[in-house]
Amino acid sequence: MDKLKIALQYIMPKHLLSRLVGKLAAAELGAVTTSVIKWFIKQYKIDMSEAAQSAPEAYASFNQFFTRALKPGIRPLCDDDDYIVHPVDGAVSQCGPIKEGRIFQAKGHEYSSLALLGDQADDAKRFEGGDFATIYLAPKDYHRIHMPIKGTLSKMTYVPGELFSVNPLTAENVPGLFARNERVVAIFETEIGPMAMVLVGATIVASIETVWAGTVTPPTGKKVFTWDYPTEGPEAITLDKGEEMGRFKLGSTVVMLFAKDALEHFADGVEPKAVTRMGQAFAKID
């Protein structure tokens, strides 16, 4: 059955399906939308007591529900300045060192940081010998993405690609998954050096948004797009630790890269399959 699920992903029209689901998720269909939201809450056992708006009827579209805000204070930030924090609610897929420019995906699978970053060689060099962490957001999770540490945006890259599912089964069976899927790479300058936050698209992920650019929707095609941002002056985009930096519409994966010697060690309990909560201690900084 698992082999069949993987095989179907290779042949299904993933981009067409994702566009269709995206339109449906954005539609405001009144009672129909509310019924779908109620089914989703029950199916995935979502704790709506954490949401700023707990009633399904409060959301005009499925997208509004999926990108729902949490109640203030429900995810307190780790107040130890020696630690950066988890950027999302999810589960750790993998974490560890970047070895000779390679990132571990799953048993028998790895990919290059160069490919992940859209073949931007200068960017990849900045993370040689550093560390990475991959966090998977399941459908039940809170889908806003926050800053692990205060940072100033220096570059954004949009990389077109496939839209395979990014669940654990696919990660274990599709080579180079996160460097094959459509993604948005945001590079920040921080007190511990450069940090890359790679927001990876997936099947039925309607779009990826950032707080500075909105929905990232370059023209369709195979071209990589890059944007450079000033890191000083009134136009610099600086986000505080814990501040929202983006969101997924229908969920996916975040891959983070850190420079060599930026992290002393990952926090206790940060290991594959560990559940993460935004704001909890993620890694001790060097």
UniProtKB/Swiss-Prot annotation:
Pfam families, A to Z: PS_Dcarbxylase (PF02666)
Asked if DNA-binding is a keyword of the record, the answer is no
Cofactor binding, note field: Binds 1 pyruvoyl group covalently per subunit.
Instruction: Recite the UniProt keywords alphabetically.
Output: Cell membrane, Decarboxylase, Lipid biosynthesis, Lipid metabolism, Lyase, Membrane, Phospholipid biosynthesis, Phospholipid metabolism, Pyruvate, Zymogen
The residues that cross the membrane are none
The annotated pathway is: Phospholipid metabolism; phosphatidylethanolamine biosynthesis; phosphatidylethanolamine from CDP-diacylglycerol: step 2/2
* Major place of residence: membrane
Compartments where located: Cell membrane
Listed disulfide bonds for this chain? none
Q: What is its EC number?
A: 4.1.1.65
Q: Which domain of life is it from?
A: Bacteria
Membrane disposition = Peripheral membrane protein
Which residues in this protein are found as Pyruvic acid (Ser)?
Answer: S252
Q: Which GO terms describe its molecular function?
A: phosphatidylserine decarboxylase activity
Necessary cofactors = pyruvate
Modified after translation how? Is synthesized initially as an inactive proenzyme. Formation of the active enzyme involves a self-maturation process in which the active site pyruvoyl group is generated from an internal serine residue via an autocatalytic post-translational modification. Two non-identical subunits are generated from the proenzyme in this reaction, and the pyruvate is formed at the N-terminus of the alpha chain, which is derived from the carboxyl end of the proenzyme.
- Site features described as Cleavage (non-hydrolytic), chain residue numbers: G251, S252
Oligomer status and interactors: Heterodimer of a large membrane-associated beta subunit and a small pyruvoyl-containing alpha subunit.
PANTHER family for this protein: PHOSPHATIDYLSERINE DECARBOXYLASE, PHOSPHATIDYLSERINE DECARBOXYLASE PROENZYME, MITOCHONDRIAL
The family classification in the record reads:
Belongs to the phosphatidylserine decarboxylase family. PSD-B subfamily. Prokaryotic type I sub-subfamily.
List the protein's name. Answer: Phosphatidylserine decarboxylase proenzyme
